[in-house]
Amino acid sequence: MRAVLLHGTKDVRVDDVPMPRIVEDGDAIIQLAAACVCGSDLWPYRGIDPISSPVSAGHEYCGVVQEVGASVTNVKPGDFVVGSFFASDNTCDICRSGYQSSCLDRRPMGAENCQAEHVRVPLADGTLVATPSTPDPDLIPSLLACSDVLGTG
C-alpha cells in the first residue's frame, strides 16, 4: 500500500509499505477516508526534529473498519470511525477521568502512519468512535477535528 514518509528535512515521499495487520487481539485495521497534517508533523519536515531514517506522518484520521481483532467489541467491519491521535484503553482511572492522552497504556498513533491507505489501530475499543452511519463525503474533513479532540479530553 502507499504511505507518506518523511525521509529528511523537506523530503516527503509516497512510498510502498507493507499492509498493516492485526498484531494484538484489541487491534482494528482501518481503510482511511481522510487524514490531516498536524503542526507536530511539520517539526521533522522543517528540520527542527532531525530524523535519520524514514518516519511515518500523520496521527489524526477517520475511515472505515476493515478488520478487527478477537477481543474488539465496540466497532465492527463496515463501521465509519473517527480515531484519536493517541490509542488508549479508555478503561483506566486516567481515561475514565477524561484524560485519554495520558492513559496508562497510551500509544502514539503517529508511529502507525495515519497518512496511508490503511492503518492499524491498537486498543480499538478505547480509541475508535463509530458514527451512526457513513457520513456525507462533504462532512468527512470536518470529522478530523474530532480526532484531535477525542484524545485531549
Across the structure, where does each feature detected by a protein language model lie?
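Buried hydrophobic positions in well-ordered alpha/beta secondary-structure cores of metabolic enzymes
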Residues: 3, 17, 41, 63-65, ...
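Residue-level signal for short segments within beta-strands and strand-turn junctions
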Residues: 5-7, 46, 65, 96
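Short polar catalytic/cofactor-binding loops
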Residues: 8-10, 35-37
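Short glycine/threonine/proline-enriched tight-turn/helix- or strand-capping micro-motif at secondary-structure
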Residues: 11-18
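Sequence contexts marking disulfide-bonded cysteines in secreted/extracellular proteins
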Residues: 18, 37-39, 102-104
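Glycine-rich beta-strand-centered segment in the early N-terminal region that forms part
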Residues: 20-36, 48-93, 112, 132-135
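Cytochrome P450 core scaffold surrounding the K-helix E-X-X-R motif
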Residues: 40-46
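NAD(P)H dinucleotide-binding glycine-rich loop of Rossmann-like/cofactor-binding domains
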Residues: 89-153
